[in-house]
Amino acid sequence: MRIGVPAEITAGETRVAVTPETAKKLIAQGHTVCVQSGAGVAASVPDAAYQAVGAEIGDAAAAWGSDIVLKVRTPAQAELAGVKPGTVVVGMLEPYNAEGLQRLASAGVTAFALEAAPRTTRAQSMDVLSSQANIGGYKAVMLAADKYQRLFPMLMTAAGTIKAARVGVLGVGVAGLQAIATAKRLGAVIEASDVRPSVKEQVESLGAKFIDVPYETAEEKEAAEGVGGYARPMPQSWLDRQKAEVAKRVAMADVVITTALIPGRAAPVLVTEDMVKSMKAGSVIVDLAAPQGGNCPLTEPGQTVTKHGVVIVGETNLPALVAADASSLYARNVLDFLKLILPKEGGLKVDLEDDIVAACLMTQNGEVKRK
């Protein structure tokens, strides 16, 4: 099969879907890999690195003219204009974006959105959400440390003692856990909150304190456990109690990192304007939920702003700020998914009996398959 890797055209997107490491493996399996010139430059991968492993370098038309096209972000209308029907497109194709899925269906492509892979042990190696969230959690702390005008670790010097920074992490998924681990390495004192009781042990294993809000009803406990590794909307009674508890900790925090997302919905508000007003001047909020509206109503997606003396970072694509490693992990996720649709005997196989393939299939034969 001919596999194309076009350059990403989304503003601020620096990642690339194939690295020389994964290109080499695809070529060893008998495939031809065509990379658009410059596709990997922003991720520190020059054209020569692809050529060294046997990949072809071409223009956008050559990459898009392939049997399979590997992307990071969902294609724009202009990219799909010359695509032949039946082309397979694999990437982070926004499964909850109905307009985008219809655009893919209208182009006649067979589209696989890797974000839709089930949260199962078998699918772990192709879990793009986790691989990219890991990097996002790390970078969130590094940005916070950069914006915060004090030190993270406690420092005892002849000139006096500097207190360790207090960091609050709201939402303890993959990004939140990595944020805790990174902040801990920098010497901060960390508290973390999440609706799921099962993460308490993970939080404490990383050296942070879990902000515990007891459940008073069976309904609250059931909702907190979530579905498929994702959080579910919580009952209002529990949210009110959590909000009060979190508000106390936010007021004491020097840095707050929010990571709470619910698939297909606007991000829940965790840090209200009143909470921001209660924070010390010079404190920092890094809102990882900015792409879905933000966990703080004062967040401005794509911007860093100062409100009520607090710096609020609304960066919408943190993994793209660590493009080389983000691309490396993402490319391995893509490679593992391709093993499911490119059997060793050759050709393309869309096996809907495979739960991962079925979950990721968004469009086929001009129809939107996702329900």
List each language-model region with its residue ranges.
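Adenosine-phosphate binding glycine-rich loop
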Residues: E115, T121-A159, A290, C296-K371
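Glycine-rich phosphate/diphosphate-binding loop of Rossmann-like nucleotide-binding domains
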Residues: P6-V45, P153-R249
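A structured beta-alpha segment of the ubiquitous adenosine-cofactor-binding alpha/beta core
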Residues: G54-W64, T74-P75, K221-V256, A260-E273, ...
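Glycine/serine-rich phosphate-binding loop and adjoining beta1-alpha1 elements at the start
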Residues: R2, E8, P75-R166
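Rossmann-fold NAD(P)-binding glycine/threonine-rich loop
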Residues: P95-A123, R265-L318
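An N-terminal-biased, well-structured beta-alpha scaffold segment characteristic
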Residues: V5-R103, A107
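Glycine/threonine-rich flexible loop motifs
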Residues: G12-A17, A78-G82, G91, G229, ...
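Short glycine/serine/threonine-rich phosphate/pyrophosphate-binding segments
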Residues: V174-T182, K200-E201, T259-A260, R265-L270, ...
